[in-house]
Amino acid sequence: VEIINAFTSSPESPPAGAVDILRAGLIPLLILKLKTESDEIQELILGTLSNCLRVEASEALASDVITILKEKLTHPSVTIRSKAAQVILEIGTHPEGKSTVCEEVIPLLVSLLEDADPEVQASAAGALMFATIKPKGRCLALRAEAIPRLLKLVAEENSKARLSAIKTLTMLAEVAEGRRKLLECTNTFQQCLRDPSEAVRRAAEIAIRVIQWKPF
């Protein structure tokens, strides 16, 4: 596993080694190893899966990866929780992955927005951002009370999750219920217009426009 992880830990996006692992059909074996290996090896496997699933996710989904990742999202290890959320983020970038993430892990991701570790928060917010692209994902996130947790991350100037949280809230504002709740909180987004990051400032501008949109 350490050799595989080194093979995929390249600065390329996606790493060249990830494609070779996919072609070799090793994804089901790596997923199976998550059940039995030590925490240290699990961290390596999750890092490898993250790189591989950036390329293609169908084999992992067929191997019931979501069930195992759900367990890892509540693991005592901060690194394992963060890496598991990152794998879910990569799965959510694929059309076939969004539905699975919506159906199975949104409540867990919402709870991780309050994790004590900033990396876990950032990975969870990123995964939610992709999961809420689908209407069903937005409804499930609203039902899981995602808005107050996301707003808290937006209000934290140094939060690593700030950009993903703003984008996720923009998705939730596409739903009438979400827009109503967020209309009372536009000041939080106004503060982001002074953020040093251009991406954050631009995302905040879009969020404010969507929240304040009114039908003719």
Whereabouts are the PLM-identified features?
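Alpha-helical solenoid repeats of the armadillo/HEAT superfamily
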Residues: 1-9, 20-23, 37-51, 74-92, ...
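Recurring C-terminal helix/loop segment of individual leucine-rich repeat
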Residues: 16-19, 58, 96-99, 139
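Buried hydrophobic core positions in alpha-solenoid tandem helical repeats
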Residues: 29-31, 68-70, 108-110, 149-151, ...
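Extended amphipathic alpha-helical scaffolding regions
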Residues: 49, 66-69
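Alpha-helical adaptor scaffolds
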Residues: 133-136, 148
